[in-house]
């Protein structure tokens, strides 16, 4: 299929190639005894031995047990044992006394229809073997799913006499059939076979539509792609789906009165059948044949291939100008269509598959064979060669020039083709791969060796073992021959009008059927729900031309990736470059998969997924290595595990963080590593600026790229405009509220909304840690967990808290709702769903996003009413504004990214403030309940140790309050911090624990540690010192004292936990405690990075580079970046190295989990930094939307994966 001589009916292996290298081919010899040494065969059957044979490699005997065929490479002397041959499913055509290996169509290997249904025992045996193969391939052998699937198949066979393959099983089976094809030289690409499932086909008309789409996809404007379309399986008591043509594209052969043939003599019979069925021939040498297609129990029907589908290449020679005048041509796509596909005992008589040509198939076989076009002598005469004697080697010279012309012409036309030297070299690599992976590879030497240059290719010198595995492709009798099956008789000729109408109907169906069967999987990983919302929008867009499904990453089985066609990923990045919580299992499984370009003998390069995700950069030598290999790869290289996957990724994040979109970058990188094909460069949306606009531009580009790749969809841009238009997004008449009998229970409601386990803690105390003279507040919140197992934690972990909105804000918003339900009435939103043919009828369906609750409860506990509305929501509000001016202003804000971002940045308005700015906007209750984002949990570092405070969780929280509009706007409050500060003992707090395994003290207490945390960045370190204090006092340990670097404004106002730290230092927890004061009277401003540089430079270098110690940094993004840069400079200075080298050292420290960061979001003092980042993002986004830069471009200096 990469090269089709293997299985296509272009009969006749090269003459005289039985040779000694075919030993072990006969199935009757079996694997029980080793193949005899070639030296014992008659000398006339042996290739000449090399003059200087290299010594044989040491023999590695297979495990004790049955003897396996011994296979030698006579060129290099290596010897292997083919253990896979013991799994052969079928005897070959040979007998103990006769070798029939050179027969083209051995009768024993033909798939003939059985007179009756297959015996259930035989079918079950084959089915079990295949199901076992499938589950072994996905590493689920013996699992509950495996056993359950076997039981399902057994029950189905018992009830119906047959069974149906799942789609993933069909994909696996079709790829394995190609992998097992012993006559195919191009199998190294078996993993890249694109499988189209056409088992729902019901008529010859539908068959033709599927086939047209197959040709269009596989041809791909000359950049050929291997593909197979599988039609319904053979069923007892019913005729077969059959394609009468041996290939989808063939040239006609017209028998002349003198017995000669004009055109291709191999196709005379099918040409005459087409004429009998109404085709009007053209009588040319290269007329493309129509297709004869047959549905079960119906006569065959004739279909003309639309000319625009068939790509042909006129043949010319690079130096022989007269060659073009010969008028030769050949088609681009070799697509075998008359072979039977067998998978697990099921037979698919119609399963056309295609790849690309090896040049000798055209130049030597099709054009030069005497029983084909037979142009050899004509070319030799034109070359002035002496054709009177064979000793002039005129045949060889002419054949070479014809092959040169074929290669030159295909390359000139930019049509995929491979020469026989490259193809056979790739087959040797495939043999090596298969020997490692499966212990052998079935191969028919007589078909693998090309028809010219035999001993000049490496396969000539390679012994091979031929045997037959399942799944497999098998030959089958022509449908019009032998005992005629029902419906194969010749019917009346069709008129030209009837044929033309059939073509017209088929052309109109093209694309529709393709869209129905090209499935797309859209995966999202989300912390706040925004990635999920984007994924759902992407699903609506792709529904225009594909069959998409939208799944959360934690709902997806990663092994399915190997059988996917198209995957789109939309994901956020959490905290310090980590996956969102619902993406962690996906990330771990993705890292465990193996790929073709990332194997490494060095174990240190197999990093944990979080560490590697945070370390991936273009400067990583491992990444650079496989990217170089990927760029240099071709159709003669092996495909990765995801060889048939096309993918694209969009990441959400903030450029204020040092690991901007790190998880999305890593998924994008990893999918390519595993062999997937990227349709579009990574898209990135910055929450500081234009995130929604960036997503919409990327989504449109991704949709257009996918449509072009799979040859579906007509107007991608129009579809995207339709999907993202405000008129389509929300319609008042499609939503209503329905009264519900049951009221809200808060904890189950939060579990429903956030799709995670929640627990209820209670307040023990809330204490202000700052001086009463301070204008700010930092509180210590003590929670009582009641000993709940779900709230167990380790120091360094995070706690997620679900706060409510302020009651005053909720009441003010309720007063603006135009049609509020009764204040105490629980309601649910219902949406009017359109009916679909064969699906449920139109009707009202409940929106599952929120549990039944009152409108006040929804606005209080579940919906975000304080964040600035998105452009999408502003577009909806513009359609509800009564004043034209307000409508225009809202529309302008929603459409102009820069204007929106400036408005949002200056005002940071809540929803209520937007309504005050645009008072004519009507506010339906269903709009609030369906379009407002969810109120997200707030995360805090745990500030305690369970050993010191069992049953408690402590939080250190800065209470946030600020004014917008340069300090002149309304006062805004932190949702969670303000709520926590107002709680009383006994008040409930819904919460949960999120582990942070990469931010924990080392298990070895003797390793030195440096802790850096200004302000509330000291929070996790309080748990650290409490744990160490417990180890000292309760376990008698003597850990190496740690160093703490703390920062605050003023020693008299906000020096948090000063007394606790002094006590811990006195007890041996800390060796040094250093504090930086940024607002201390009569002292210069000092920050934690200044302390590191001036007082701890030598210690930082010693701890990190000489003593294998650890450094922990906790704080906001600006501080963390400054500390990182300072540490880099310290290592460069103290270690006498270049700055770039120091950056690499920090990368290694991260990989070794010795440089730890716990970074939280933007604070008020980061405005200068974020303003600069927003300016960069604006420039980048505008250039992306103009197409001036790729979606993955980063402005200079913004490589957030490098220190």
Swiss-Prot record:
Stimulated by calcium/calmodulin. Inhibited by NOSIP and NOSTRIN. NADP(+) binds at residues 776, 1016, 1049, 1078-1079, 1085, 1087, 1089. L-arginine binds at residues 247, 356-357, 361, 366. PROSITE patterns: FAD_FR, FLAVODOXIN_LIKE, NOS. It is found in: Cell membrane; Membrane, Caveola; Cytoplasm, Cytoskeleton; Golgi apparatus. Heme b binds at residues 184, 475. InterPro entries: CysJ-like_FAD-binding, FAD-bd_FR_type, Flavdoxin-like, Flavodoxin/NO_synth, Flavoprot_Pyr_Nucl_cyt_Rdtase, Flavoprotein-like_sf, FNR_nucleotide-bd, NADPH_Cyt_P450_Rdtase_alpha. Transmembrane segments: none annotated. Residues 491-510 are annotated as: Calmodulin-binding. GO terms for cellular component: caveola; cytoplasm; cytoskeleton; cytosol; endocytic vesicle membrane; Golgi apparatus; Golgi membrane; nucleus. SUPFAM superfamilies: Ferredoxin reductase-like, C-terminal NADP-linked domain, Flavoproteins, Nitric oxide (NO) synthase oxygenase domain, Riboflavin synthase domain-like. Its main location: membrane. Zn(2+) binds at residues 94, 99. Produces nitric oxide (NO) which is implicated in vascular smooth muscle relaxation through a cGMP-mediated signal transduction pathway. NO mediates vascular endothelial growth factor (VEGF)-induced angiogenesis in coronary vessels and promotes blood clotting through the activation of platelets. Homodimer. Interacts with NOSIP and NOSTRIN. Interacts with HSP90AB1. Forms a complex with ASL, ASS1 and SLC7A1; the complex regulates cell-autonomous L-arginine synthesis and citrulline recycling while channeling extracellular L-arginine to nitric oxide synthesis pathway. This is Nitric oxide synthase 3. It comes from Homo sapiens. The lineage of its organism: Eukaryota, Metazoa, Chordata, Craniata, Vertebrata. The gene is NOS3.
């Amino acid at each position: 299929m990469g090269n089709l001589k293997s299985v296509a009916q272009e009969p006749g292996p090269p003459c005289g190639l039985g040779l000694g290298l075919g030993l072990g081919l006969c199935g009757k010899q079996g694997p029980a005894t080793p193949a005899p040494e070639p030296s014992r065969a008659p000398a006339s059957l042996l290739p000449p031995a090399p003059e200087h044979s290299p010594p044989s490699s040491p023999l590695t005997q297979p495990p004790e047990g049955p003897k396996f065929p011994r296979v030698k490479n006579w060129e290099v002397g290596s010897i292997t044992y083919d253990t896979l041959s013991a799994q052969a499913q079928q005897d070959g055509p040979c007998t103990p006394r006769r070798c029939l290996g050179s027969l083209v169509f051995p009768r024993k290997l033909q798939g003939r229809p059985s007179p009756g249904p297959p015996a259930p025992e035989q079918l079950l045996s084959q089915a079990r073997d295949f199901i076992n193969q499938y589950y072994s391939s996905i590493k689920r052998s013996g699992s509950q799913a495996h056993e359950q699937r076997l039981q399902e198949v057994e029950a189905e066979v018992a009830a119906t006499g047959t069974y149906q393959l799942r789609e993933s099983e069909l994909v696996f089976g079709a790829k394995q059939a190609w992998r097992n094809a012993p006559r195919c030289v191009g199998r190294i690409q078996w993993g890249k076979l694109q499988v189209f499932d056409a088992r729902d086909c019901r008529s010859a008309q539908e068959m033709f539509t599927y086939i047209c789409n197959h040709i269009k996809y596989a041809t791909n404007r000359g950049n050929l792609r291997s593909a197979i379309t599988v039609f319904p399986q053979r069923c007892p008591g019913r005729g077969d789906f059959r394609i009468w043509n041996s290939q989808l594209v063939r040239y006609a052969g017209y028998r002349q009165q003198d017995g000669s043939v004009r055109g291709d003599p191999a196709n005379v019979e099918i040409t005459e059948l087409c004429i009998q069925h109404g085709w009007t021939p053209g009588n040319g040498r290269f007329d493309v044949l129509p297709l004869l297609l047959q549905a079960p129990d119906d006569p065959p029907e004739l279909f003309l291939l639309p000319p625009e589908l068939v790509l042909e290449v006129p043949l010319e020679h690079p130096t022989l100008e007269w060659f073009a005048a010969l008028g030769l041509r050949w088609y681009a796509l070799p697509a075998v269509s008359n072979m039977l596909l067998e998978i697990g005992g099921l037979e698919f008589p119609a399963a056309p598959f295609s790849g690309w040509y090896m040049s000798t198939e055209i130049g030597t076989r099709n054009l030069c064979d005497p029983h084909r076009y037979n142009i050899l002598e004509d070319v030799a005469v034109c070359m002035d060669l002496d054709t009177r004697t064979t000793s002039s080697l005129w045949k060889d010279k002419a054949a070479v020039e014809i092959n040169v012309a074929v290669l030159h012409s295909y390359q000139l036309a930019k049509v995929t083709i491979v020469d026989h030297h490259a193809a056979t070299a790739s087959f040797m690599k495939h043999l090596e791969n298969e020997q490692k992976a499966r212990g052998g590879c079935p191969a028919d030497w007589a078909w693998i060796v090309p028809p010219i240059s035999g001993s000049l290719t490496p396969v000539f010198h390679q012994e091979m073992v031929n045997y037959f595995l399942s799944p497999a492709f098998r030959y089958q009798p022509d449908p019009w021959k032998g005992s005629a099956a029902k419906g194969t008789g010749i019917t009346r000729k069709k008129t030209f009008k009837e044929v033309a109408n059939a073509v017209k109907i088929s052309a109109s169906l093209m694309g529709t059927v393709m869209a129905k069967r090209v499935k797309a999987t859209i995966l999202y990983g989300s912390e706040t729900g925004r990635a999920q919302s984007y994924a759902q929008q992407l699903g609506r867009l792709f529904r225009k031309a594909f069959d998409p499904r939208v799944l959360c990453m934690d709902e997806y089985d990663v092994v399915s990736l190997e059988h996917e066609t198209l995957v789109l990923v939309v994901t956020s990045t959490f905290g310090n470059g980590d996956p969102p919580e619902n993406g962690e299992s996906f990330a771990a499984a993705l890292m465990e998969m193996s790929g073709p370009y990332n194997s490494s003998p060095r174990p240190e390069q197999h990093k944990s997924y979080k560490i590697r995700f945070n370390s991936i950069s273009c400067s990583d030598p491992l990444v650079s290595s496989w990217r170089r290999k990927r760029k240099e790869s071709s159709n003669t290289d092996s495909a990765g595990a995801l060889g048939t996957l096309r993918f694209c990724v969009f990441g959400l994040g903030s450029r204020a963080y040092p690991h901007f979109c790190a998880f999305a970058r890593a998924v994008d990188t990893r999918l390519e590593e595993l062999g997937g094909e990227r349709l579009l460069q990574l898209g990135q949306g910055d929450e500081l600026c234009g995130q929604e606009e960036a997503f919409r531009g990327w989504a449109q580009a991704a949709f257009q790229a996918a449509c072009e790749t799979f040859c579906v969809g007509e107007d991608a841009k129009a579809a995207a405009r339709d999907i993202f238009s405000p008129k389509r997004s929300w319609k008042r008449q499609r939503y209503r509220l329905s009264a519900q009998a049951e009221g809200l229970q808060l904890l189950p409601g939060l579990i429903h909304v956030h799709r995670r386990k929640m627990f209820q803690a209670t307040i023990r105390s809330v204490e202000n840690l700052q001086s009463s003279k301070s204008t700010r507040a930092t509180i210590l919140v003590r929670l009582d967990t009641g000993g709940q197992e779900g709230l167990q934690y380790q120091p360094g972990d995070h706690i997620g808290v679900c706060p409510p909105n302020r009651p005053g804000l909720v009441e003010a918003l309720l007063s603006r709702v135009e049609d509020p339900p009764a204040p105490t009435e629980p309601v649910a939103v219902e949406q009017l769903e359109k009916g679909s043919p064969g699906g449920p009828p139109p009707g009202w369906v409940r929106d599952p996003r929120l549990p039944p609750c009152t409108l006040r409860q929804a606005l209080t506990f579940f919906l975000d009413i304080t964040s600035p509305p998105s452009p999408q929501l502003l577009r909806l509000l513009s359609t509800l504004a009564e004043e034209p001016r307000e409508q225009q202003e809202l529309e302008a804000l929603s459409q102009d990214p820069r204007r929106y971002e400036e408005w949002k940045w200056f005002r940071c308005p809540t929803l209520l403030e937007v309504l005050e700015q645009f008072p004519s906007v009507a506010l339906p209750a269903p709009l609030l309940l369906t379009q407002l984002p969810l109120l997200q949990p707030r995360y805090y570092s745990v500030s305690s140790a369970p050993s010191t405070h069992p049953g408690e969780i402590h939080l250190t929280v800065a209470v946030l309050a600020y004014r917008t509009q340069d300090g002149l706007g309304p006062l805004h409050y932190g949702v969670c911090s303000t709520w926590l500060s107002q709680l009383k003992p006994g008040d409930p707090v819904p919460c949960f624990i999120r582990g942070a395994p990469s931010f924990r003290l080392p298990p070895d207490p003797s390793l030195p540690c440096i802790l850096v945390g200004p302000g509330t960045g000291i929070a996790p370190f309080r748990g650290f010192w409490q744990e160490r204090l417990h180890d000292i006092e309760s376990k008698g340990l003597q850990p190496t004292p740690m160093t703490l670097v703390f920062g605050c404004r003023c020693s008299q106002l906000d020096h948090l936990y000063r007394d606790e730290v002094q006590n811990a230092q006195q007890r041996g927890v800390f060796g040094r405690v250093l504090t930086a004061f940024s607002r201390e009277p009569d002292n210069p401003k000092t920050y934690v990075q200044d302390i590191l540089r001036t007082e701890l430079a030598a210690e930082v270098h010693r701890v990190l580079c000489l003593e294998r110690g650890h450094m922990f940094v906790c704080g906001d993004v600006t501080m963390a970046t400054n500390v990182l840069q300072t540490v880099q400079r310290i290592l460069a200075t103290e270690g006498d190295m270049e700055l770039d080298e120091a950056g690499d050292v920090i990368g290694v420290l991260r990989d070794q989990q010795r440089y730890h960061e716990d970074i939280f979001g933007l604070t008020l003092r980061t405005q200068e930094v974020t303003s600069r980042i927003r300016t960069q993002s604006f420039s980048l986004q505008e250039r992306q939307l103009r197409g001036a830069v790729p979606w993955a471009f980063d402005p200079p200096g913004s490589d957030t994966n490098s220190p």
